[in-house]
Swiss-Prot record:
MF terms in GO: phosphatase activity; pseudouridine 5'-phosphatase activity
Keyword Ribonucleoprotein annotated: no
Organism: Schizosaccharomyces pombe (strain 972 / ATCC 24843)
Keyword Nuclease on entry: no
Location in the cell: Cytoplasm; Nucleus
Family: Belongs to the HAD-like hydrolase superfamily.
Domain of life the protein comes from: Eukaryota
Name of the protein in question: Putative uncharacterized hydrolase C1020.07
Any one annotated GO CC term: cytosol
Annotated CDD domains: HAD_AtGPP-like
Length: 236
């Protein structure tokens, strides 16, 4: 069944930011005579808001910083790295295919506005596809403490699409007719909590540290693929 709308995560799903997160984190760890960064810990951080991910990292590393201090240090370390990000394989073809099928799309990322702008500034050819349907992890419409794995961010993303449809006299799209694309377990949980179907595209480097629960593994509404390259959205 062809989805009526597709909703996307960003980091590690649309663009290759995860390698930069790993690199910048190892730079910080080295500064404090610690490291290397654990992929198991990274897997736990993925999909979380900046503050939640920072708390997980600081608890693991033992570095004596507040979440706010660590986030500021990460931003400083990453400043020159984000401009090197590029779309992951299959992404541009998929977005073009969705456009040709007139399937509306939205972006729901846990990245805050500052990081989103840094990551996307040189990738307008990718993010222009979203027609402004973008919500970040610090969006005021997202209640505090209700980031992924809670479903709220997907409901807000879908509302952006439906508000435009309503203005054009079109019927609203229901959550069960949406397809969410995610690379993290946290994101998969979030999409399913919203009542949406999910395509899980895990990073093969972190896959050994990811595992679906028995219920998730048996969930026919979760489809696992290792790449969006050659992905056929009409056959999910």
């Amino acid at each position: 069944m062809i989805p009526e709308a597709c909703l996307f995560d960003m980091d590690g799903l649309l663009v290759d930011t995860e390698s930069i997160y790993t690199k910048s984190t190892n730079i910080i760890l080295k500064r404090y005579n610690k490291g290397p960064f654990s992929m198991e810990v990274k897997a736990k951080m993925m999909g979380r808001t900046s503050k939640e991910a920072s708390r997980i990292f600081l608890d693991w590393s033992g570095i004596d910083l507040t979440c706010e201090e660590y986030i500021a240090l990460q931003r400083e370390t990453q400043a020159e790295l984000w401009r090197h990000t590029k779309p992951l394989p299959g992404v541009m073809n998929l977005l073009s295919k969705l456009k040709s099928l007139n399937i509306p799309i939205a972006l729901a990322t846990s990245s805050d506005t500052h990081n989103f702008e840094k990551k996307s500034a040189h990738l307008s050819h990718l993010f222009d596809h979203f027609d402004g349907n973008i919500i970040t992890g610090d969006d005021p419409r997202l209640p505090v403490g209700r980031g992924k794995p809670h479903p709220d961010i997907w409901f807000i993303a879908l509302k952006m699409i439906n508000d435009k449809r309503k203005a054009q006299g079109q019927a609203e799209i229901l959550p069960e007719n949406c397809l969410v694309f995610e690379d993290s377990i946290t994101g998969v949980q979030s999409g399913r909590a919203a009542g949406m179907k999910v395509v899980w595209v895990p990073d093969v480097n972190i896959l050994p540290f990811f595992s679906l629960s028995p219920e998730q593994a048996a969930d026919k509404h979760i489809t696992k693929v290792l790449s969006l390259e050659n992905f056929d959205v009409t056959k999910v």
